Amino acid sequence: VYKRQMQELLVRCPDLDGVVCVTDTVAFGAMRALREAGRHVGQDVGLAGVGDSWAGSMMEPGLATVRFYQKQVGQEAARILLQMLEENGSSGPVRQVTLGYQIVERGSL
């Protein structure tokens, strides 16, 4: 599916020079489609994903990605859930939570 979506994007935007995918898995399909279209990832077109999957570092070129800190996400989710339980299930006011991330630059950019 992801490969087909990238193929369709290349038809609509033949001069495309960069793609950021919602996950690393989507980026893997995009990378395959780009290669099959004769595009050189990291040279003709930059490609990045989100999630920092181990497979991304094994690709050639390595997949640039955004790394989120899952432990921090889990801790914050647990804290909010416990707070809701203490308040008898009330979600209370809408709150904004800012979590850390790291951009991992690899050869696909």
Regions found by a protein language model. Name each.
Residues 5-109:
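Flexible loop/turn connectors
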